């Protein structure tokens, strides 16, 4: 777990939402274009019904109600017909509103599903470097908080803003129809309101962006604290961790409080300004009507009637209220844009590059051990296949350009490789060679310095050294989790840079110190090593590494469901299942990254025999945690600050009484 100080000093990015975010959101939404069209039509019908109802008030009062006042025997039929028509308008508006809210559900959920699918698909293509440099809790926040804010915007904010704008435009046109002077007065008043609301929204928008960033940061800290709870308790870091969390939570509180304070002010301000406009219009309208001043509308010049005044007052509310609703929804949109920007930032991260062209294929091997025929079924023999036109000449020329011992190592690899007559097939034997390799996670700070070494097919190579010596880095480079800055890594005489990454990794079985099990049965977790493996092959792999007896003691044996990364199993049991997973993959080469470091001594004795069976005939790289596990290695390499300072067998290195001797006798601590 990262220390508290590094967490304390780390600040999330506080940039503004990307201006292209809205365009990208709508590119997803318009995948449902016909539903969107239907939603727009329903919103237009609703706005027209609302404006029509307000206009109808004028006719209802002036044409039907006022003429009946004072009559001894009024005719109610026309009034009832008018009220029925008005009711139909209201019903049309209600049905249209219900329809678009029903339609938006599919658009909303479908859009989010597509975004999550694309985000996860892109995430699967990201290099390991990305996950090593980003908190997992922050990545998870993209799928939870960020998508939830986007959901609210798609289902509520965007359609309601559009509906409000259409309603405001309809109300404006209706007011112009009735009275141009009164409409001008409303517009001037609205411009004043616009500047007030703009100031409020701009303040809230900045804080909503900060809020989303801090939510991701807090989530990342909580996840790391939960994963490291044992470490926190062992070192009595509860108070320090609590203090760091409180500081981050305080930042989130301040950003959220500011964002929501300014966001919640919008509607009260607009509402009260709307009441003020209503009162002013009523006073001015009454004065104009009593003075007998004619009014000017799109229909001509005529006196300001009671019906016209009531319609204008109603329309003014229908004009101001949508503006308030737009202002309020803008705060939600700002939050959604902040979340969407984070989502699209993840989706814009550069994917893992793979310029390799060499693939891994099944072959049938002739009796001479050199003749190869490519087949489409598993044979137990593999070969590297170059693309058409590549007979290996290019890699040979690259090897010839190397100097000194590196050139000698590379040329021997080429000579010893078993290749077909046309040069396109090279038998996979597990011959791995580093030539003048220099690498740093930060190019300016190399972790490995001009490393040259080789592993012959079937050899067991142990990498030992203190923490930070570069042991794990070597294995990261073999499977191309990272690419080297200088030098060359050869696999059966072929540069790993020229091999397609999926094929390269298929040839390597990896057992890590940190075990990851997935929700599912024990059988499913073993089969994860090779998805097309049968149940019998999975059981055979478990027997090979002496895991079968332990699994059969579980409640449902191989069908026991594991949850929460194998909670309920001991660390050693989880490690055993991961070793069986590597066994079922049946890889030509193995990387054991401190594979038995989490297993107690007694359990280690049980699994070691199985591990020996698994390693037979394979090139194996072992990152040593316990030196007792590497005594029978063919070659032991001692690394120190990125340099190979010693190499040889156990007995040879003990006799030298150098660094390995110091590690073995306990004079220097091994990690």
Residue ranges of each PLM-predicted region?
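Transmembrane helix-loop-helix hairpins at lipid-water interfaces of multipass membrane proteins
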Residues: 36-99, 176-181, 290-306
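Helix-loop-helix
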Residues: 174-188, 262-341, 346-347, 370-415
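ABC-type nucleotide-binding domain
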Residues: 363-671
């Amino acid at each position: 777990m990262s220390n508290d100080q590094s967490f304390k000093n780390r600040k999330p990015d506080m940039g503004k939402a990307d201006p292209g975010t809205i365009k990208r959101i709508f590119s997803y939404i318009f995948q449902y274009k016909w539903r969107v069209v239907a939603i727009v039509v329903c919103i237009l019908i609703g706005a027209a019904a609302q404006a029509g109802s307000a206009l109808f008030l004028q006719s209802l009062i002036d044409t039907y109600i006022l003429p009946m006042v004072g009559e001894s025997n009024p005719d109610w039929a026309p009034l009832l017909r008018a009220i029925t028509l008005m009711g139909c308008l209201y019903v049309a508006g209600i049905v249209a509103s219900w329809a678009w809210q029903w339609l938006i559900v599919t658009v909303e959920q479908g859009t989010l599903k597509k975004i999550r699918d694309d985000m996860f698909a892109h995430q699967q293509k990201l290099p390991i470097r990305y996950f090593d440099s980003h908190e997992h809790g922050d990545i998870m926040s993209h799928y939870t908080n960020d998508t939830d804010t986007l959901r609210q915007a798609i289902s509520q904010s965007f359609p309601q803003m559009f509906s409000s704008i259409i309603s405001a435009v309809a109300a404006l046109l209706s007011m112009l129809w009735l009275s141009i002077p009164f409409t001008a007065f409303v517009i001037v008043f609205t411009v004043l309101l616009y500047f007030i609301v703009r100031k409020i929204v701009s303040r809230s928008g900045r804080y909503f962006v900060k809020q989303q960033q801090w939510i991701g940061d807090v989530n990342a800290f909580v996840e790391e604290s939960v994963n490291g709870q044992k470490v926190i308790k062992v070192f009595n870091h509860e108070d320090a961790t609590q203090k760091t969390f409180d500081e981050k939570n305080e930042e989130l509180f301040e950003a959220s409080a500011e964002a929501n304070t300014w966001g919640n002010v919008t509607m009260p301000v607009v509402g009260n300004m709307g009441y003020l406009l209503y009162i002013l219009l009523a006073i001015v309208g009454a004065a104009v009507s009593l003075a007998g001043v004619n009014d000017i509308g799109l229909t001509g010049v005529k006196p300001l009637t009671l019906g016209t005044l009531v319609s204008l007052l109603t329309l003014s509310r229908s004009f101001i209220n949508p503006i308030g609703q737009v202002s309020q929804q803008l705060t939600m949109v700002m939050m959604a844009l902040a979340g969407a920007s984070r989502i699209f930032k993840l989706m814009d991260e550069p994917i893992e590059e793979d310029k390799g062209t060499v693939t891994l294929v099944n072959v049938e091997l002739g009796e001479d051990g050199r003749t190869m025929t490519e087949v489409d079924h598993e044979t137990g023999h593999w070969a590297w296949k170059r693309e058409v036109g590549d007979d290996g000449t290019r890699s040979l020329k690259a090897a010839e350009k190397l100097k000194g011992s590196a050139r000698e190592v590379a040329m021997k690899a080429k000579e010893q490789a078993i290749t077909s007559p046309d040069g396109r097939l090279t038998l996979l034997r597990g011959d791995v060679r580093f030539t003048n390799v220099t690498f740093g996670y930060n190019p300016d700070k190399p972790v490995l310095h001009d490393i040259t070494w080789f592993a012959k097919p079937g050899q067991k190579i142990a990498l030992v050294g203190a923490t930070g010596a570069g042991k794990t880095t070597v294995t990261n480079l073999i499977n191309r989790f990272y690419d080297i800055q200088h030098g060359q890594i050869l696999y059966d005489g072929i540069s790993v840079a020229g091999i397609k990454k999926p094929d390269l990794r298929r040839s390597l079985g990896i057992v890590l110190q940190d075990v990851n099990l997935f929700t599912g049965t024990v059988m499913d977790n073993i089969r994860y090593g090779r998805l097309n493996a049968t149940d019998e092959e999975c059981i055979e792999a478990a027997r090979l590494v002496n895991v079968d007896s332990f699994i059969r003691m579980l409640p449902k044996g191989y069908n026991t469901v594991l949850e929460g990364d194998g909670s309920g199993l001991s660390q050693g049991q989880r490690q055993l299942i991961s070793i069986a997973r590597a066994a079922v993959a049946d890889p030509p080469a193995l990387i054991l990254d401190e594979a038995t470091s989490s297993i107690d001594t007694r359990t280690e004795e049980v699994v070691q025999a199985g591990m020996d069976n698994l390693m037979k005939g394979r090139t194996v790289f072992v990152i040593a945690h316990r030196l007792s596990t590497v005594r029978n290695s063919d070659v032991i390499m001692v690394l120190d600050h990125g340099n190979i300072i010693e190499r040889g067998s156990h007995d040879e290195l003990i006799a030298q009484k150098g660094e390995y001797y110091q590690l073995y006798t306990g004079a220097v601590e091994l990690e």
